[in-house]
Design a protein with these regions (language model features):
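Conserved ABC ATPase "signature" region
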Residues: 101, 116-135, 159
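Helix-to-loop junction immediately C-terminal to a conserved catalytic motif
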Residues: 52
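Conserved ABC ATPase signature
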Residues: 112-113, 138-142, 146
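The feature captures the beta-strand-to-loop junction immediately N-terminal to the Walker
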Residues: 37-39
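ABC ATPase nucleotide-binding domains
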Residues: 239-288
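Conserved ABC transporter NBD signature motif
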Residues: 60-68, 77
Length: 288
C-alpha cells in the first residue's frame, strides 16, 4: 500500500479535449509543500485547476488519502481541499468577515446557518491572517493584496487537509508576502497541512518548498527537492534566460555582466562584495 498522501499518475490536462501537458506524476506526504514553477503560459494554472476538479483531466488519476478525487462527493472534497485562485471574486454587500465565513459552508446544513463553533473558527482564521482591521469592511472596497489575505483566511476557515494556491503572493507587498508564506509553512509543519502552490518568486520557492514541480510547456521537466532543482544552470535553462542568469549559489537573478576588459578586480568573500558588484554593474564598469 502506498504511503503517499496525495499523488497523481499518468495525469494529462488540457482544454476542450486538447492535451496541454501529459503524464504528470508527483507524490506528496502529509504536511509537505509542493511549488509549481515555470515560464508564464507553461500550464501551471491548468494543472492546479485540474487538481481541484475545476477542469476535468483528460487522462490519469488524482488520489487523495487513498481515494480517487473524481469519486468523492463535492461536499467531502470541499472538506478535504480548499483553494485560493488568482481569479477575482467580487461578492456584493458582504464584509470581509462574511466572506471568510463562507469557508464554513461545507460543514453547515442546507440553509447555511453557522453555529457558535463555526464563528469561533471564522474568528480564529481572521486572527491567524491578521485581518482583524478589515473584518467589518466592505470586501469590494479593499485592495487586491487585502482581498488575497481575506481569501486565505476563507480557505483556512474550511479547515482543509490540502491547500491549493495559484500565485498567492502576486498582489502582496514584501511584509505580507513573507507573513503569508510564513503562516503557510507554520501550518504545514505544525498542523500537517499539505500545500500545493505556484510561485514566480524563485527565491521564495527555494526556501519554502519540500518538493518542486517544473512545468515547461507540454511536459513536466523535473520533479524533486529544492536541492535537486535549484542547482547549476537548470533554472536559467528552464526559463530560457538570455539577458542574464539565475545564480544557484546565491539564489538570485543576475543581469548580464558588463562586457569589456575588466578595469577593477574585486577581492571579497562571504557575500561581502555584493554591494560593490552591484554598484560597478550600475555604472557600466567591467570588473572581475
Amino acid at each position: 500500500m502506498r504511503e503517499d498522501y496525495f499523488y497523481t499518475e499518468g495525469l494529462t490536462v488540457g482544454y476542450q479535449g486538447v492535451p496541454l501537458i501529459r503524464e504528470i506524476a508527483f507524490q506528496l506526504k502529509k504536511g509537505e509543500i509542493l511549488t509549481l514553477i515555470g515560464p508564464n503560459g507553461a500550464g501551471k494554472t491548468t494543472i492546479l485547476k485540474s487538481l481541484i476538479r475545476q477542469l476535468k483531466p483528460l487522462a490519469g488519476v488524482i488520489v487523495l488519502e487513498g481515494q480517487k478525487a473524481d469519486e468523492m462527493s463535492g461536499r467531502d472534497f470541499a472538506r478535504k481541499l480548499s483553494v485560493v485562485l488568482t481569479e477575482r471574486v467580487r461578492p456584493e454587500m458582504m464584509t470581509c468577515k462574511e466572506v471568510v465565513a463562507t469557508g464554513r459552508y461545507p460543514y453547515t446544513g442546507k440553509f447555511g446557518v453557522l453555529s457558535k463553533e463555526d464563528w469561533k473558527i471564522v474568528d480564529e482564521a481572521v486572527r491567524l491572517v491578521h485581518i482583524e482591521d478589515l473584518a467589518e469592511r466592505d470586501f469590494t472596497k479593499t485592495s487586491d493584496g487585502q482581498k488575497q489575505r481575506v481569501m486565505l483566511a476563507r480557505a483556512l476557515c474550511q479547515q482543509p487537509d490540502i491547500l491549493v494556491l495559484d500565485e498567492p503572493t502576486s498582489f502582496l507587498d514584501i511584509r505580507y508576502k513573507l507573513e503569508f508564506l510564513s503562516i503557510i509553512q507554520e501550518m504545514a509543519r505544525n498542523d500537517r497541512l499539505t500545500v500545493i502552490l505556484s510561485l514566480h518568486e524563485l527565491d521564495l520557492a527555494e526556501r519554502i518548498s519540500d518538493k518542486v514541480l517544473c512545468v515547461r510547456g507540454d511536459r513536466i521537466d523535473r520533479f524533486g527537492t529544492p536541492e535537486e532543482i535549484f542547482c547549476g544552470d537548470y533554472i536559467s535553462e528552464l526559463y530560457g534566460m538570455t539577458a542574464g542568469h539565475y545564480d544557484a549559489g546565491t539564489g538570485e537573478l543576475e543581469l548580464q555582466p558588463v562586457s569589456g576588459v575588466p578595469k577593477v578586480f574585486v577581492i571579497a568573500g562571504g557575500g561581502r562584495g555584493k554591494a560593490v558588484f552591484r554598484r560597478l554593474q550600475r555604472q557600466g564598469m567591467p570588473f572581475a
